[in-house]
Amino acid sequence: MSLLKYYQKLDDAVAYLFSSTINEKKLLNQFFKNKEITFVDIGTNMGNYLSFIQKNFKIKNAYCFEPINELCENLQKKHGKNVKIFNCALSNKEKKRKFYIYEIPSQSSFYKQNKTYSSLQKIKKIIKIESKIFDKIFNKNLKIDFCKIDAQGEDFQILKGMSKNLKKGNIKLLKVEVCFPDVHKDVPNSYLDILNYLNKFN
C-alpha cells in the first residue's frame, strides 16, 4: 500500500504539516498498533519523523538514510538503539553527483532551488556524494513494515531503485512526500509519474 501527499498550494501543504502527525498516527495505528515494526526512513534529515515513529510505535529495527555527515553524527547519538544510519543518498544509479546543502537542512537536494522560493535558496555548501540503490542494500527479502521517502525531488529515482522489493511485496506501507513541481530545477519526474509507477505494483 502506498500513501502519497501532494499539494499544489503552499498554504495547503503548511496546514497539512501542522496536522499530519495526528492524522498519520491514526492511520499507522490501523496497521501497527501493538506490533513491532521494521522501519526505513529515506531522507531522515534531523530525525523529526524518526522521533515521531519511535515515540508512537514499537521499533524492531530502523534503517535511516541521510547524506549530510553532520546530521548523521547527531542521529547516531540520539537514536542509536535499534537504528542503523547510512550516510549516503539513494537513487536508481550508483554514481557521484553534486549535492546542494542549504542553510535550512531539510531543503538539501541533488537539485538547485528555483527562484520561486527565494527564502529557501541560501546554499551553505556543495558536496559530491555517491548515491546507492535500495535493492542492492535490501537484497535478502527483508520484510519492511513501513518505508518513508522524503528526498527533495529524487523520490521517483529512489522508487525505481527499489522495484525488486516492490514487486516482491516486501514493503507493507510506503509513504512518499512529493515536492511542488516548481521548487527545484530539472527534476525529471512529476507527481503523476510517481503515481502511475506505483500503480504497477498494486
Residue ranges and their predicted role:
Residues L4-D11, A15:
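S-adenosyl-L-methionine
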Residues S19-I104, N114, L120, F180-K185:
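SAM cofactor-binding core of SAM-dependent methyltransferases
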Residues V40, F52-C64, N82, I137-I149, ...:
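Conserved acidic-Pro-Pro-aromatic motif
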Residues N87-C88, K128-S131, K148:
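Conserved residues in the N-terminal Rossmann fold of short-chain dehydrogenase/reductase
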Residues S119-I127:
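A recurrent flexible, glycine/aromatic-enriched loop bordering the glycosyltransferase active site
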